[in-house]
Design a protein with these regions (language model features):
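N-terminal secretory signal peptides and thylakoid transit peptides that target proteins
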Residues: 1-18
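Beta-propeller domain segments
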Residues: 76, 96-98, 106-108, 120, ...
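Acidic, Gly/Ser/Thr-rich repeat motifs that build Ca2+-stabilized beta-propeller blades
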Residues: 29-176, 245-252, 307-344, 369-391
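Beta-propeller fold detector
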Residues: 40, 81-88, 141-150, 212-216, ...
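Conserved blade-ending motifs and adjacent loop-strand segments that build the rim/top face
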Residues: 348-369
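Sec-dependent signal peptide cleavage junction
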Residues: 17-30
Length: 397
């Protein structure tokens, strides 16, 4: 039997966290953590897990490991890790590798897994890919793998792939693509150029085709898969369970990290409108988003000088505990904690850091229904999958 370790975080202070918590649009300070959550390691030994999703019919997780390009089934009840064969070859240089995973909304009737990853062409240039394959649990494999889309163009760069993917309420695929770390800020930046896929969210049908309803399908020389643009390197993407809005967490330059509600056809600002500064300076990257009418302002942000919140995977809580109902949880990489955001419509009211004393780079978080727990993937060598429960006493078994 697996030994389950429970870590008490009671009494945790906020010393050293204030810069990471920062201020939001209403300039209200972050709240202090309650420090009474219970943390359990349910699986261990993963190599830089980047994403996980829940199989709805047996409550196992599908987990990606970025650097080694491995896809596995993880059982949170006993800690068993089952690698799956048939995964596409990836390029793991820089920030690349095997990245996100999503399941078809009609799973298991439609047994498709959707994978995002970086891969190279014959010239060694890379880009963000999305592929799908059928999960065969009997053979522990992914079969009938087909590439659905390759972000264009391929480049000799290895950073800012974006790569979060989810199904929207319309049962279409939404995928983030990073700006590949182009730093020629201004109106000609790749994130403002719709002839490429960089700095965007793409919308695709489950078979990879472009929906006729996409906002730019009738415009010449524009990439038809683009749903919205003006993002830097969005590594969190989730659907609000009540409003059906798509929320994104986007990395800023120096600070300037954002929580964004996506709008079809919208310009979300990067880099012509941004709350952050250029690296190593106090010089603004662009105009303030709230001073421009041609961009969509984020619903929450960290201004230059606050320390920022380098965000990763995110989810709205859909579990059974009343205290967390409607809250948004976002992984913080550099700050090394899980951020809890209390959301009222489009207003972010408060922040609470969870598991902030363990030096865990929180890469992804999921909230399965019919349980009070969150599950978190930590980005590290020999990394754990964690179960986090609210408001309970610590224990060991």
């Amino acid at each position: 039997m697996q030994r389950r370790q429970y870590l008490s975080v009671a009494g945790l202070g906020v010393v050293g966290l204030a810069g990471c918590l920062g201020l939001g649009p209403d300039s209200e300070p972050a709240i202090e953590p309650t420090g009474d959550e219970r943390v359990e390691t349910v699986a261990d030994g993963l190599n830089h897990p980047w994403s996980m999703t829940v199989l709805p019919d047996d409550f196992r997780f599908v987990v990606t490991e970025r650097d080694v390009g491995r896809l596995s089934l993880v059982d949170p009840e006993n800690g068993d890790i089952t690698p799956l064969s048939g995964v596409p070859e990836v390029d793991a240089e820089g920030q690349g590798g095997l990245l996100d995973v999503a399941v078809h909304p009609e799973f298991p009737t439609e047994p498709w897994l959707y994978l995002t990853y970086s891969a190279a062409n014959n010239d060694g240039e890379t880009t963000t890919h999305i592929a799908r394959g059928r999960l065969n649990r009997d053979d522990e494999s992914v079969t009938d793998v087909e590439v659905l889309y390759r972000a264009q163009p391929f480049l000799d760069r290895s950073n800012h792939y974006g790569s979060r993917v989810t199904f929207g309420p319309d049962e279409r695929l939404y995928m983030t693509v990073g700006d590949r770390q182009f730093r020629d800020f201004g109106p000609d930046h790749v994130s403002q150029d719709l002839t490429n896929d960089f700095g965007t969210v793409l919308r695709l049908e489950p078979d990879g085709s472009v929906p006729d309803a996409n906002p730019f399908v009738d415009e010449p020389d524009v990439r038809e898969a683009i749903y919205c643009y003006g993002l830097r390197n969005a590594q969190g993407l989730t659907v609000h369970p009540e409003t059906d809005e798509l929320w994104v967490s986007d990395h800023g330059e120096r600070d300037g990290d954002e929580l964004v509600i996506l709008e079809a056809g919208a310009n979300h600002g990067w880099p012509i409108a941004h709350y952050g500064c250029r690296y190593g300076t106090d010089a603004p990257v662009g105009d303030r988003p709230d001073e421009r009418e041609d961009v969509v302002d984020p619903v929450y942000y960290w201004e230059c000088g606050t320390g920022g919140f380098p965000p990763a995977g995110m989810t709205f809580y859909e579990g059974t505990h009343p205290d967390w109902q409607g809250d948004l949880f976002v992984g913080n990489l550099a700050g090394q904690y899980l951020g809890r955001f209390a959301v009222d419509d489009r207003e972010v009211e408060e922040i609470e850091p969870l598991v902030a004393d363990e030096d865990w780079r929180v890469r992804d978080v999921v909230s399965p229904p019919e349980t009070d727990a969150l599950f978190v993937a930590v980005d590290a060598d020999a990394a754990p999958i964690l179960r986090i429960e609210p408001g309970q006493e610590s224990s060991t078994e």
